[in-house]
Amino acid sequence: MFSRLSRSHSKALPIALGTVAIAAATAFYFANRNQHSFVFNESNKVFKGDDKWIDLPISKIEEESHDTRRFTFKLPTEDSEMGLVLASALFAKFVTPKGSNVVRPYTPVSDLSQKGHFQLVVKHYEGGKMTSHLFGLKPNDTVSFKGPIMKWKWQPNQFKSITLLGAGTGINPLYQLAHHIVENPNDKTKVNLLYGNKTPQDILLRKELDALKEKYPDKFNVTYFVDDKQDDQDFDGEIGFISKDFIQEHVPGPKESTHLFVCGPPPFMNAYSGEKKSPKDQGELIGILNNLGYSKDQVFKF
């Protein structure tokens, strides 16, 4: 699985990266905020799983791509840690001029044990309330956070291998998972990432992903898929979508000790696994993974 993959020439299927319909998640949070699986941590952790919002300042804003930025947030002290575990996320909040709360979940891309600060990679969506707000901020402005929220409780060596299927900013939770698995010398799980974007320039966290592949060639592999490589003659990936045939050829089958994690915009989710019904309900498994014979219990939707 980790040998050089043969190039496919599938007909390009554009990976829609339009506005993600996440307003329902906000309503769900406020209706069920006492039911989330919060993670409790020691006193040196900033986020303790309680109901307290913490205002944190932006220390740096960097351009990740033409429509995506990396925000670095400063923790209260240089020795502070987030308090997240694998795999978990945070809620971010701002209050509109009319007094309405806008809340969205975000997965930090920093090392979970990073001290003093953490980073979010955020894509700007046209009409997106939170992303428009964040893109209007500057260093020293603050954002309210709370959490952490457990998404999937990872247990080392639970599976022989896992496959991550992602598109766009869906890479964030997948990268968190991959990074911490391969960096753990006691976790022998092999990680295979299939990551789709419109162009090579849209590939997020590419530097970090390529570094993992170079450092841990026996544990981690990534294959990039783009609709159009444009003028990038150095692009060493696949042109087209992540096809059923490609998955069948390069991903461990449903009878093996494996698990699949999927994250991306709604069209991507519907094509491969179907969307979650809510943050607490994974919904039915449909799409390509269902057609390949994987069961609902073998696929997790971030």
UniProtKB/Swiss-Prot annotation:
**Record: residues binding FAD:** 158-193
Signal peptide stretch: none
Provide the positions where the record notes the PTM Phosphoserine.
S278
Residues that make up the propeptide are 1-41
Q: Which reaction does it catalyse?
A: 2 Fe(III)-[cytochrome b5] + NADH = 2 Fe(II)-[cytochrome b5] + NAD(+) + H(+)
Q: Which GO terms describe its molecular function?
A: cytochrome-b5 reductase activity, acting on NAD(P)H
Q: Where is the FAD-binding FR-type domain?
A: 51-155
Fetch the InterPro entries from UniProt.
CBR-like (IPR001834), Cbr1-like_FAD-bd_dom (IPR008333), FAD-bd_FR_type (IPR017927), Flavoprot_Pyr_Nucl_cyt_Rdtase (IPR001709), FNR_nucleotide-bd (IPR039261), OxRdtase_FAD/NAD-bd (IPR001433), Riboflavin_synthase-like_b-brl (IPR017938)
The portions of this protein that span the membrane are: 12-32
Induction of this protein: by what?
By osmotic stress.
| Cofactor(s) essential for the protein | FAD
Annotated Gene Ontology cellular components are: mitochondrial intermembrane space; mitochondrial outer membrane
In the Enzyme Commission scheme, what number(s) does this protein have?
Answer: 1.6.2.2
Show which residues form the site (Cleavage).
Answer: N41, E42
CDD domains, sorted: cyt_b5_reduct_like (cd06183)
Alphabetical keyword list:
FAD, Flavoprotein, Membrane, Mitochondrion, Mitochondrion outer membrane, NAD, Oxidoreductase, Phosphoprotein, Transmembrane, Transmembrane helix
User: Which protein family is named in the record?
Assistant: Belongs to the flavoprotein pyridine nucleotide cytochrome reductase family.
Its function?
The outer membrane form may mediate the reduction of outer membrane cytochrome b5, and the soluble inter-membrane space form may transfer electrons from external NADH to cytochrome c, thereby mediating an antimycin-insensitive, energy-coupled oxidation of external NADH by yeast mitochondria. Involved in the reduction of D-erythroascorbyl free radicals.
Q: Would you tell me the protein name for this molecule?
A: NADH-cytochrome b5 reductase 2
